[in-house]
Amino acid sequence: MKLLIVSGGYTDFDFAIDLIKKSGFEIIIAADSGLNFFKAADITPDVVVGDFDSVNQEVLSYYRDNEFIDFHVLNPEKDDTDTEYAIRFAIEKGADSITILGGTGTRLDHVMGNITLLGIGIEYDVSIEMIDAFNRIRVFNKSLL
């Protein structure tokens, strides 16, 4: 099953829209402020996860009223990031391929932290890639080649 996670980092709008239209994702997840992208794109995600400390509150209210979205409200005092929770949720749902948008951007510390999250895929034998308009980052072992 192919899943998409959109996190809160910079996302090239046109690139992301094109990817979503062409890739046939079976489940689309917004991780916290990644929800802002969906509102701008007029797309409804299937799942929303986060402590919602960085999402626009009007956007959050707009989607919270949608009974077809599976909401997961996280405790702000947690060890995992919203993106990590989204990855683990995707794996629990049976994902064998996860694509992350918004995992790169202007904060190098966030980019490096998100790159380390790709290793979760090795642990569960799930292909995880983080992409943007210029880069594709993957971590894999022999079983994921």
Predicted regions mapped to residue ranges:
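N-terminal beta-strand-loop-alpha-helix module at the start
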Residues: M1-Y62
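Gly/Ser/Thr-rich loops at beta-strand to alpha-helix junctions
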Residues: T11, T104-D109
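Glycine/charged-rich beta-loop-alpha catalytic/anionic-binding loops adjacent to active sites
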Residues: D65-L74, I98
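Short phosphate-binding loop-to-helix
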Residues: D70-E92
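N-terminal glycine-rich phosphate/adenylate-binding segment common to multiple enzyme folds
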Residues: D96-G105
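Short Gly/Thr/Asp-enriched flexible loops that form oxyanion-binding sites at enzyme active sites
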Residues: L108-G119
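Short, acidic/small-residue loops that bind anionic groups at enzyme active sites
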Residues: I120-I137
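Long, charged alpha-helical interface segments
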Residues: N135, F140-L145
